[in-house]
Amino acid sequence: MSGFLLALRTTFGFLSTIPVGMSMEGLDELVKRSYLQTFAGIVLGSMIGIFAYLTESFLPSTISAVLIMVFIYYITGLNHLDGLGDFGDGATAHGSLEKKVNALKDMSLGIGGVSYTVLALIALYASISSLQAEVLFFSDNAALIIAISLLIAEIGAKQAMLTVAAFGKPIHEGLGSMIINNTTFPRYAVSFVLGALVCVLAFGTLGIIGYISAIVTAFVILNISIRHFKGINGDCIGTSNEIARIIVLMVLTVAITAVNNGYGGLFWTPL
């Protein structure tokens, strides 16, 4: 198998629950091709969007929102949510830098991690529900708009991870440091352009607004990580995935409302 195909297979093995397998050789090839993570976001986001379109078309909104959340974690797995929990433990730990880093790396889940995880799940549900309410009120294409918004959110989530990796410094050796050390600016730029292009094609101006909000979120997570841990690890990268997805959906909800109320002169045209 060529290096590219091995990296492609590993991308989905690493970022999803699709049973394609994963190996250290594949990870070595993947970190050389960071843009494949954004490509995975496009594919996974499309799958989530299609699922959301079907549930929005045939089921009540509340049930649809819950099922969308279930499908997101069914297809993407819980690794990044677990990273958010570890990040919460580290960020809320009191004491020295060493204690914070130890809490970040600790395999057990504390009250800080539980709180961050629960709040993130509540926020994800709230963001999906708010998006549903706005598009149902303003548009006859509600299911399509929700599907496209979820696509952009997933692309943004994956680009947020690459942003943290590209601009952060590792605090210890491991899988996270492999990704961080190999996410060079040229590789990051390729993934950034790929993600931006798809978001613009899918949702016009609103697409790029949502995408940029994910990048901004990543820099906020990076800043918090540096303040607490003096660097980043894989948990910090995973945290950016979870938080960016939520922020993109919230920003798109606000932007869609503004557009439909006639503010800002923004226009969007779903494909």
Swiss-Prot record:
The gene is cobS. NCBIfam families: cobS. One of its GO terms (molecular function) is adenosylcobinamide-GDP ribazoletransferase activity. Its cofactor is Mg(2+). The lineage of its organism: Archaea, Methanobacteriati, Methanobacteriota, Stenosarchaea group, Methanomicrobia. The keyword Cell inner membrane does not apply. Its EC number is 2.7.8.26. This is Adenosylcobinamide-GDP ribazoletransferase. It catalyses: alpha-ribazole + adenosylcob(III)inamide-GDP = adenosylcob(III)alamin + GMP + H(+); alpha-ribazole 5'-phosphate + adenosylcob(III)inamide-GDP = adenosylcob(III)alamin 5'-phosphate + GMP + H(+). Pathway: Cofactor biosynthesis; adenosylcobalamin biosynthesis; adenosylcobalamin from cob(II)yrinate a,c-diamide: step 7/7. Keywords: Cell membrane, Cobalamin biosynthesis, Magnesium, Membrane, Transferase, Transmembrane, Transmembrane helix. The chain crosses the membrane at residues 4-24, 35-55, 58-78, 108-128, 135-155, 192-212, 246-266. GO terms for cellular component: plasma membrane. It comes from Methanococcoides burtonii (strain DSM 6242 / NBRC 107633 / OCM 468 / ACE-M). InterPro entries: CobS (IPR003805). It is a multi-pass membrane protein. Signal peptide: none annotated. Joins adenosylcobinamide-GDP and alpha-ribazole to generate adenosylcobalamin (Ado-cobalamin). Also synthesizes adenosylcobalamin 5'-phosphate from adenosylcobinamide-GDP and alpha-ribazole 5'-phosphate. Its main location: membrane. It is found in: Cell membrane. Pfam families: CobS (PF02654). Belongs to the CobS family.
